[in-house]
């Protein structure tokens, strides 16, 4: 208890001093604040039975009951911060933050798409700092949006598969048409060795072609062989077409592309060997290999006497051809076969012109080949220039 006389401030009074009006005793209710003024510790005292506007600062010596000071110290330790309204407001402001963080965490767990949830939670975090009042409405809007997006994602696999299939078929059609156009464009292409012939002169030989186009299904290389006789008495060679089951793997396609490019560069000097090696990879059916070997061995003996009888003036090209057949070709790929497999099965006619169009990745290489000069060059060219077989 501390006493304070209204007449004499700062003086202590007695509890039962009611007779003397000067020294009245006032009971202290509690201590509100503490300060140090000029090195003296003072406490702001709330007097019992008096309004707060009558609170006064009293030095520590005027407080007789030490328990008031102890209660004040314990209250400050338990609260940890001074009891000021401004500080209380600052403490209450972070209270809504844990709710928004919990909601954001729950929203991130329930969402199927992790990337979308992260983006939406980051956007939601920025907006929650700006507008805390619209937090629940904004969260509901994001939840509805995520449901719509998940519904769209559930429909997306079929739609994506359909578009992918449509795009794939459209691309294959474009590749097929472009390769056909490029092959048709290069039909009249004539290599440099045949410098005397023109495109108008080669038009009768349009039927004797072999085309290698990109197939529609697998995108691999296939060869379509079309031959027609130079004279009316020669029978056409049966058409051979490689089916997708007989095609080579994708590695052979790349090797065929390299071989085709090499055939274009070496067309001047090695026009007879390199195109045949190119045919070996592109035009060999796996099923008829053994049959062609037997037929080639049987008819190889018949070809030697027949060729001089039909072409008596030019025996040298046939001899060169026989030498080339005896010499083993260097295998350009692991699956390259010897000449007896890829030579025509019935090749008793030696003056036939064969035009091969090899199309790989929208690039076409045209190869014209003949075993003799007759049929490859026109008769007037043979009279003027007796060049070897090109």
Swiss-Prot record:
Describe the subunit structure. Component of PRC1 complex, which contains many PcG proteins like Pc, ph, Scm, Psc, Sce and also chromatin-remodeling proteins such as histone deacetylases. This complex is distinct from the Esc/E(z) complex, at least composed of esc, E(z), Su(z)12, HDAC1/Rpd3 and Caf1-55. The 2 complexes however cooperate and interact together during the first 3 hours of development to establish PcG silencing. Interacts with stx; the interaction targets Pc for ubiquitin-independent proteasomal degradation. Interacts with Nup93-1.
GO molecular function terms here? chromatin binding; DNA binding; methylated histone binding; sequence-specific DNA binding
Residue ranges with Low complexity bias: 177-200, 236-254
Positions with biased composition (Acidic residues): 96-106
Is Transmembrane one of the keywords UniProt gives this record?
no
GO-annotated cellular components:
chromatin; nucleolus; nucleus; polytene chromosome; polytene chromosome band; PRC1 complex
Xref: Pfam families: CBX7_C, Chromo
Please list where the region (Disordered) is annotated. Answer: 1-22, 73-318
Name of the protein = Polycomb group protein Pc
Fetch the CDD domains from UniProt. Answer: CD_polycomb (cd18644)
What is this protein's function? Polycomb group (PcG) protein. PcG proteins act by forming multiprotein complexes, which are required to maintain the transcriptionally repressive state of homeotic genes throughout development. PcG proteins are not required to initiate repression, but to maintain it during later stages of development. Component of the PcG multiprotein PRC1 complex, a complex that acts via chromatin remodeling and modification of histones; it mediates monoubiquitination of histone H2A 'Lys-118', rendering chromatin heritably changed in its expressibility. Promotes locus-specific chromatin compaction.
Q: Where in the cell is it found?
A: Nucleus; Chromosome
Record gene name: Pc
Any keyword Nucleus? Answer: yes
**Any one Gene Ontology BP term:** negative regulation of transcription by RNA polymerase II
- Entry's Gene3D superfamilies? 2.40.50.40
InterPro entries recorded for this chain?
A: CBX7_C (IPR033773), Chromo-like_dom_sf (IPR016197), Chromo/chromo_shadow_dom (IPR000953), Chromo_dom_subgr (IPR017984), Chromo_domain (IPR023780), Chromodomain_CS (IPR023779), PcG_PRC1-like_component (IPR052458)
């Amino acid at each position: 208890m501390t006493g304070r006389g209204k007449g004499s401030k700062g003086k202590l009074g007695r509890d039962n001093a009611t007779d003397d009006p000067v020294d009245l005793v006032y009971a202290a209710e509690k201590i509100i604040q503490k300060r140090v003024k000029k090195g003296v510790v003072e406490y702001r005292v709330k007097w019992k039975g008096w309004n707060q506007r009558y609170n006064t600062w009293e030095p520590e010596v005027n407080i007789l009951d030490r328990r008031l000071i102890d209660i004040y110290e314990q209250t400050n330790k338990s609260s940890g911060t001074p009891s000021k309204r401004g500080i209380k407001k600052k403490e209450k402001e972070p209270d809504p933050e844990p709710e928004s963080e919990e909601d954001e965490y729950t929203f991130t767990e329930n969402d199927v798409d992790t990337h979308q949830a992260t983006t939406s939670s980051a956007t939601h975090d920025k907006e929650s700092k700006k507008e805390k009042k619209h937090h629940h409405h904004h969260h509901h809007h994001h939840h509805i949006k995520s449901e719509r997006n998940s519904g769209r994602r559930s429909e997306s696999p079929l739609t994506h598969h359909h578009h992918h299939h449509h795009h794939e078929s459209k691309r294959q059609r474009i590749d097929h048409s472009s390769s056909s156009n490029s092959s048709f464009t290069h039909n009249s292409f004539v290599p440099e060795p045949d410098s005397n012939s023109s495109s108008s002169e080669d038009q009768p030989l349009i039927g004797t072609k072999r085309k290698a186009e990109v197939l529609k299904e697998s995108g691999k290389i296939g060869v379509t062989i079309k031959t027609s006789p130079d004279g009316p008495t020669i029978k056409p060679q049966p058409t051979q077409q490689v089916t997708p089951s007989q095609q080579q793997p994708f590695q052979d396609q790349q090797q065929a592309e390299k071989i085709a490019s090499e055939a274009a560069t070496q067309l001047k000097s090695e026009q007879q060997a390199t195109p045949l090696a190119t045919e070996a990879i592109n035009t060999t059916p796996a099923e008829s290999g053994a049959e062609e070997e037997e037929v080639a061995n049987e008819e190889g003996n018949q070809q030697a006497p027949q060729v001089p009888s039909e072409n008596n003036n030019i025996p040298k090209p046939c001899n060169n051809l026989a030498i080339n057949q005896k010499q083993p070709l260097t295998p350009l790929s692991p699956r390259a076969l010897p000449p007896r497999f890829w030579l025509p099965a019935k090749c008793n006619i030696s003056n036939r012109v064969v035009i091969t169009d090899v199309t790989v990745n929208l690039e076409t290489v045209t190869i014209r080949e003949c075993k003799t000069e007759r049929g490859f060059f026109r008769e007037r060219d043979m009279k003027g220039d007796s060049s070897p077989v090109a």
